[in-house]
Amino acid sequence: MASVQLRNVTKAWGDVVVSKDINLDIHDGEFVVFVGPSGCGKSTLLRMIAGLETITSGDLFIGETRMNDIPPAERGVGMVFQSYALYPHLSVAENMSFGLKLAGAKKEVMNQRVNQVAEVLQLAHLLERKPKALSGGQRQRVAIGRTLVAEPRVFLLDEPLSNLDAALRVQMRIEISRLHKRLGRTMIYVTHDQVEAMTLADKIVVLDAGRVAQVGKPLELYHYPADRFVAGFIGSPKMNFLPVKVTATAIEQVQVELPNRQQIWLPVESRGVQVGANMSLGIRPEHLLPSDIADVTLEGEVQVVEQLGHETQIHIQIPAIRQNLVYRQNDVVLVEEGATFAIGLPPERCHLFREDGSACRRLHQEPGV
């Protein structure tokens, strides 16, 4: 196992900068997830750690060794790709031991490692099968096993679940989490799926247009996003945003005016906030309240009702706001499309963002953070 450090790492192709001044500390045995939209540079960052992409400037360390000029095969990393890339004419055991065979490992060593990893991944009964006889989840486990038998110090996974159906993704997500707990290896995982990031990670790195937007534990990013981008990316359905204007400030409070002219005091850091400033109020769909238990409410027309059984998601068009708000309740809510529906805003669950997108620090203490 080993730690990974990136110091001012930049990657550019000509004038196009895809990763800019990346600084990260990944601790020994940590499970870190790089998450962000397509094109944010997360896979490029992983490939630089693997040695598959050169670093334009900055330094990469694995353990105590600077790795910028070290070939991929000598870095002690193992990588699992979105594609299984299994040899169809080889058995599961032969696929898993292929890298060791090329490296000149003895047959006894190969057999021992393959059998050990097969037990961990529940593949022992499948070692003689060919890939065509395996399910998608089994093939992905073989690809993971092929990397594990090489005993890498750092384990890299580039969107390994993207080719699987929804049910299989959930199953494999659980298996990868169990695998990390059992092995204690340093793992770096790339995904665009924020649910995977929230459920797997010890620490999440949110990337936006080649920069690190925020690094933190899953609940920290959920409850205390550093900016509007992170707030909108982490959480599903995503956070609602309302245009507001600052009408007053006090110590550790900011008063804003909502689109319906109601005013609400928010428990957020007020330093640097100017009266009259245009800002954005954010609130998650699951934090909105029924209007009868809230002091500050918004009313609008129901556009869409999504009944999911265990919860209801209601899309509401609020006058003077171009986009819908989404209200989420963990129950069945019987309401017709076109009906008038009111929702409440609890001040302690609201977020406030400046015009540049940065967040005013929330002062309400959330559990588990």
Swiss-Prot record:
Location in or out of the cell: Cell inner membrane
A Pfam family recorded for this sequence: ABC_tran
Presence of the UniProt keyword Nucleotide-binding in the record: yes
GO molecular function, one term: ABC-type maltose transporter activity
Swiss-Prot/TrEMBL keywords: ATP-binding, Cell inner membrane, Cell membrane, Membrane, Nucleotide-binding, Sugar transport, Translocase, Transport
Domain ABC transporter span(s) in chain numbering: 4-234
EC annotation from Swiss-Prot or TrEMBL: 7.5.2.1
InterPro entries: AAA+_ATPase, ABC_transporter-like_ATP-bd, ABC_transporter-like_CS, ABC_transpr_MalK-like, ABC_transpr_MalK/UgpC-like, Mo/tungstate-bd_C_term_dom, NA-bd_OB-fold, P-loop_NTPase
Main location per the UniProt record: membrane
Keyword Translocase: yes
GO cellular component, one term: maltose transport complex
Catalytic activity: D-maltose(out) + ATP + H2O = D-maltose(in) + ADP + phosphate + H(+)
Family, as annotated: Belongs to the ABC transporter superfamily. Maltooligosaccharide importer (TC 3.A.1.1.1) family.
Subunit-level organization: The complex is composed of two ATP-binding proteins (MalK), two transmembrane proteins (MalG and MalK) and a solute-binding protein (MalE).
Function text: Part of the ABC transporter complex MalEFGK involved in maltose/maltodextrin import. Responsible for energy coupling to the transport system.
Misc: Target for inducer exclusion, mediated by the unphosphorylated enzyme III of the phosphotransferase system for glucose and resulting in the inhibition of maltose transport. Acts as a repressor of mal genes. In absence of maltose, the C-terminus of MalK interacts with MalT, then MalT becomes inactive and the mal genes are not activated. In presence of maltose, MalK is tightly associated with the MalFG complex and has no affinity for MalT.
Official protein name in the record: Maltose/maltodextrin import ATP-binding protein MalK
Organism whose genome encodes this protein: Salmonella typhimurium (strain LT2 / SGSC1412 / ATCC 700720)
